[in-house]
Amino acid sequence: FSASATFTNRFAFIHPEKIKALAIGGFNGELMLPEKKINQFKFNYPLGIHDFYQLFNKNFDINQFKSIPQFIYMGKLDDNDAVQFDDAYNDIERNLINTNLGSDVQNRYLKCQEIYKKKNINATFITYENVGHWTTSEMNLEVIKFFLNQMQTD
């Protein structure tokens, strides 16, 4: 959840072969995207995969990434936005995100969902009503059920 969700999302791009399933929530509405460019703007790591080979000395394995079942969730009232602060993103990244994905957490989350769906990423997106930047027992139970289901299909 939150910063650990952002870490998990990025780790899955770098090492998709090590992940059987993942669940992330409360991540500022900004997912790393399986795109080199959006609206003709280069999306470098940690926003996208434009410079992936240069950084990791391997190509991004989109097929392996697509094979990961992902449970991605946000609270509808979550407006916690690390994108707007220097400790999370630099000025160039912040401008790319705000201009191309949206400056509002919830709209950005919807845009990221569109991109994941267009790329056929194996993700289930859930938005929880009346929830901000926190978890509830309902959310925790859904995450548990998601992982139990993944264990049973393995």
Per-range role (PLM):
Residues 21, 29-119:
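The feature captures the conserved acid-bearing segment of alpha/beta-hydrolase catalytic domains
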Residues 26:
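N-terminal Rossmann-fold cofactor-binding loop
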Residues 6-8, 31-33, 80-82, 133-137:
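Short catalytic/ligand-binding loop motif for oxyanion handling, primarily in non-cytosolic enzymes
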Residues 5-16, 22:
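Short glycine-enriched nucleophile-adjacent loop
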Residues 1-2:
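Conserved alpha/beta-hydrolase "nucleophile elbow" surrounding the catalytic nucleophile
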Residues 23, 71, 124-126:
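A structural signal for isolated positions on well-ordered beta-strands in alpha/beta enzyme cores
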Residues 16-17, 121:
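Proline-centered flexible-loop/turn and helix-kink motifs
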